[in-house]
């Protein structure tokens, strides 16, 4: 992670507890829901990645992560109360060896790697300029500088402007962080929307 941070030298977003600190350093309160929330997304016409998180109801691992890089789905989630986090790529479980990166390729090009360090997982896509660190409690997101002003989601747009941080998916400007956060909840039949 240190290499990645020093390589890109830009801000990060983190989701911990019941709040998110955006790329532009605004704290956003999260609604009570077990639905996925859009944490960060490339909202440019390229739509290279989407990062989602949800509450699990598991006290030891209260969060699950789902991300899409290109069209590949990455999930880090507990499958039982005492399982620890499990990695699934496109629905298939991937067993990791501590400290040894799992490399996923598409069209003979490395799309991303996943490395486990004890209970901490690092997902890094160098071609797409995306880094995620996740341990089931906290999610750390960092993106390359070329995404500046092109992102949306709970992490904000990464445009260095704190004054206009609370822009929802329909480009509505919110004054309240909780209402802003509710706008990024993804309703589904298996969860309760706020």
Per-region residue spans from a language model:
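Extracellular/secreted glycoprotein ectodomains characterized by long, lumenal stretches
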Residues: 1-194
